[in-house]
């Protein structure tokens, strides 16, 4: 989708109206990584989108304009507490770095503090959680909110998407784990995903669970998705066991 945005920027040239429409489109895009680790994919997506937005503002003669891309539109799920906090902090830092780069240090510092305490990175098991509650089509999701940036989230709170109605892109690098090396917990995760769908799921790679969860998510949200995965789910015996389930999901 970043390539498409860059192509649209090239097509827009210096046309103010076309550039404005592209900026509005970018501001509504949601990026969701249900295996986000320390947030690398989310940070890259955010920085690349800010670069495109900055070029739009430059061409429109508005170089100091505040960004319209909400960092809370970049959401993730991470199993472990510490990487989840790192992912959230990495996005906060990325926002500050982009503000310094495109608007100057003075304006960036004025808006950087106090640090946000919203927790748009969910710490939990992506194969057990309802993705629609984390990245919902309506724009509001039930989220865990911490008392401060580094505190373990305890209470449920809602965080609105600041710009609703945009495109949703899902990406990630889920754990692979072949069928013969999965832990008991991972087998139970896959059973929760495939229960009622198939009986011959035990030999599937662990990453296959993310594809099925995305297929379920895409039934309710007009979304595009891509995961880094093992080639074995696209060849050999796993193809017949996994892909019919995904295709049947629509």
Residue ranges and their predicted role:
Residues 1-250:
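SAM-dependent methyltransferase catalytic region
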